[in-house]
């Protein structure tokens, strides 16, 4: 979960910018868009395979 604490001398606009940056880095919206529709078993297999490859590279 993404959280942003607003400092005493910080404006709402800058906190909102930081929040948007954190959300885009974490990939939350990309996951929502991808999982919005039904996923066939072969698509699910390919997605999991790609996730494993990405995790192995790290």
Curated annotation (Swiss-Prot):
Superkingdom, taxonomy of origin: Bacteria
One Pfam family linked to the record: Ribosomal_S21
InterPro entries: Ribosomal_bS21, Ribosomal_bS21_CS, Ribosomal_bS21_sf
UniProt key word Ribonucleoprotein: yes
Any GO molecular function: structural constituent of ribosome
Signal peptide from the UniProt entry: none
Keyword Ribonucleoprotein carried by entry: yes
Cellular component per GO, a single term: ribonucleoprotein complex
PROSITE patterns in UniProt: RIBOSOMAL_S21
GO biological process: translation
Keywords assigned: Ribonucleoprotein, Ribosomal protein
Family: Belongs to the bacterial ribosomal protein bS21 family.
Protein name per UniProt: Small ribosomal subunit protein bS21
Natural source organism: Prochlorococcus marinus (strain AS9601)
